[in-house]
Amino acid sequence: GVEGGSRGGRGQGRRPGMGGCHGGAGEFGYGGGPDSEGIALAHRGDVVVVTVNHRLSICGHLYLGEAFGEEYTTSGNTGVLDLVASLEWVRDNIEAFGGDPGNVTIFGLSGGGSKIWTLLAMPGARGLFHRAIPISGYLMWPRVSLEKATCAADAALEELGVQRGN
């Protein structure tokens, strides 16, 4: 969602933008959840707050590259790539809501904080935000080996009755 503040102390100028990323360990949560507080933050800070949803759990993190080939090599990162796409949207659209595309801060709590750390390290996210507030969360997500990721994908595909390569 997009929430705009009151323009209280800023006159008619563009307001800073904030992009909120919810917590939930990458497994659950949503952009309008209690850890986002977009409306309260927008009015208290006179900023434009954008909260987003993104793919979670196996929809956002299941690696299918070994099962389906090169076309799926980024499949384990689709949830984070959704966040990059949302930042591109903010860059292209926040001005229509009174926000400044050159002054965007991203923030996240817990699992959302971990995603903020990830965005700080991603070349594809460079230039899409200007400051970051990772509130708790892992600096580095626990690593999963290619072998473990492939085993998890194989188990999920078997449960769904899907064969490799189909």
Regions found by a protein language model. Name each.
Residues G1-R164:
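Serine-hydrolase-like catalytic core of hydrolytic proteins
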